[in-house]
């Protein structure tokens, strides 16, 4: 029996939150954390990041990124799409300008 897309989306959000916790970040699904707050982010707990989670086999990256950008407008946060296919690792998609901004602030950019 196939799982419906809402259940699969919720499962993907829990999986991504768990991955974040494995890396030391206290991330939770938005609904589980605070109900319907008007925050369209799928998960919360990474300050200044709008997280759109997609758990699909065939992702339309442009559409998913457009949704993340739209939902993060006027919030001064960086939109990302966290996505994973079956039997694959999680990937993060973000705008190049945002990636360069993060890289400049990281320890990696100074060779440490």
Regions found by a protein language model. Give the residues of each.
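Catalytic phosphate/metal-binding cores of nucleic-acid and nucleotide-processing enzymes, i.e., regions
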Residues: 1-112
